[in-house]
Amino acid sequence: MTIPYPLGPPPAPRILVLGIGNILWADEGFGVRAVEAFHKAYELSDNVTILDGGTQGLYLVQFVNEHDRLIVFDAIDYGLEPGTMKVVEDDEVPKFTGAKKMSLHQTGFQEVLSAADFMGHYPERLTLIGCQPLDLEDWGGPLTAPVRGVIPAAIETAVRVLRSWGVAVTARPEGAAVPPLLEHDIDFERYERRAEPAALNC
């Protein structure tokens, strides 16, 4: 019996680049701000989805289930110096995702991964790009300087991982129009600058 050879190359893996966190709690917004900056800087092939996951918790399971590989930006309490970036991959990820300090109403991303695993859709490849936060208690506050300074390195790490997975990553032309990730995005630079007048009036 002859087994027919599949026509054409295998389909490209479906990849999700995800930022999670709460921009209203200072450094907990790192993941969201990092994925926003990544989206503004690069264009990707059609098999890659970029998502601002915010604080959706278990609702993110549906997105994880629909993809084969996953890159996550997040603020993680590694117990390191604030502003330290740490990259954890594949089987090492679950032990770290539960360490993040989160608001009481939020579900940790570890539970999202556990739910995806239970449903038989755990990512075949997984990279967590985490940053040690300095401040998670400043309601309405911007990212602190050490955490904000990590964003360029976090973005370049995601680019390196994607290219190692065979993804074409292209820098957007300067001044190119970039569609928002969310319909009602809160602009990062405008949000961060709004704290400056208050500081000057102190």
From Swiss-Prot:
Please provide, alphabetically and separated by semicolons, the GO molecular function terms listed in this UniProt record: aspartic-type endopeptidase activity; enzyme activator activity; metal ion binding
- Show the InterPro entries listed in the entry: Pept_A31_hyd_express, Pept_HybD-like_dom_sf, Peptidase_A31
This protein's source sits in the domain of life called Bacteria
Tell me if Cytoplasm is a UniProt keyword of this record.
Answer: no
Binding of Ni(2+) occurs at: 28, 74, 105
Family matches, as Gene3D superfamilies: HybD-like
Q: Which GO annotations describe the biological process of this protein?
A: protein processing
Instruction: Identify the keywords attached in UniProt to this record, alphabetized.
Output: Aspartyl protease, Hydrolase, Metal-binding, Nickel, Protease
Among its keywords, does the record have Cytoplasm? no
Q: Which PANTHER family match?
A: HYDROGENASE 1 MATURATION PROTEASE (PTHR30302), HYDROGENASE 2 MATURATION PROTEASE (PTHR30302:SF1)
Tell me which family the UniProt entry assigns to this protein.
Belongs to the peptidase A31 family.
Quote the function comment for this protein: Not known. Could be involved in the processing of hydrogenase.
Q: What is this protein called?
A: Hydrogenase expression/formation protein HupD
Gene field = hupD
